[in-house]
């Protein structure tokens, strides 16, 4: 795909630490991912990056150099802990917000969104914060967690694409993730957004404090 011929709004790259050619450190000390993200940025894309927990690797040399070319970074508490070298409490909103702010300070341009099974927080370079608890799904509805992080990201990006507030974007994300939990596959549980949001209305949300 030739980026210069693409007129989409967002450039989504997933996942760092799982893309051998893009994770490779080049002769100039930069990674292929940073070079690609810089090109996307120069063409006017809003760059979005997601990390992966299955391959916790060399964050300092692979992830950190790319962050100044990232507009929005998604990660969970395990990835954030690996990136910062610090323990993060997944159900403590202050722990999540502080970690997200620390990662933002590493160079992310716009938003860091940190999510866990308890909910999600967002911090921005403009000083905005948003917090949203996850949907209180009953145990009998949960068939598997595979793909829930991807569903969360998709819900958030849909909200951003339709110019929703970040609080609303996080709500769309956690509701999309909740629907994903209802099937053991990575995507068959995901419904259209109205039905996803109905899960939040039906079961309520955790209080993330």
Feature locations, PLM:
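Ribokinase/PfkB-type carbohydrate-kinase core domain
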Residues: 1-72, 78-130, 135, 186-209
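Alpha-helix N-cap/helix-start capping motif
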Residues: 77-78, 150
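Conserved post-catalytic alpha-helical subdomain immediately downstream of the catalytic base
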Residues: 106-108, 136-209
